[in-house]
Amino acid sequence: MRVVADTNIYISAIVFGGSCEAILALARAHVIELYLSSAMQGELRSVLGQTFGWSPSRVKEALAEITRLASLVRPNVRLSGIVANDADHRILECALAARADFLVTGDKRHLLPLKTFRGVQIVSPRAFLDLLR
């Protein structure tokens, strides 16, 4: 099963644990295949470093762990006008490039209301875990 986890899922998994960490555990156990893009890596670097005040070495360590779990894809389309937040376009681009079955996100304002996008099911972490039970 091909999955793109929104950057908010990685942040929540790393900082808070819970259901988002359970999604990363599924990738560690090879139950799901995770994908991310360089734009998503940049957003993760920025949020962990600037928003959470992590040191560069701690950010590098977290990104290394994520990179071990997720395959890097290079989106070949540039989306706009679908959602209000441009960073969310980068997430959708990654999902398309990965040919993802699911996009897992906590974004209730922009992404979850879409429900599906070009064949990609967009679900919350809890809904995704429930689907796998």
Where are these regions (language model features)?
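Amphipathic coiled-coil/heptad-repeat helices and related helical stalk/stem segments
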Residues: S19-C20, V59, A87-D88
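Short secondary-structure boundary segments
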Residues: S38, G106-K108
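Acidic, PIN/NYN-like endoribonuclease modules and their adjacent C-terminal/linker elements
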Residues: I82, H89, L96, D101, ...
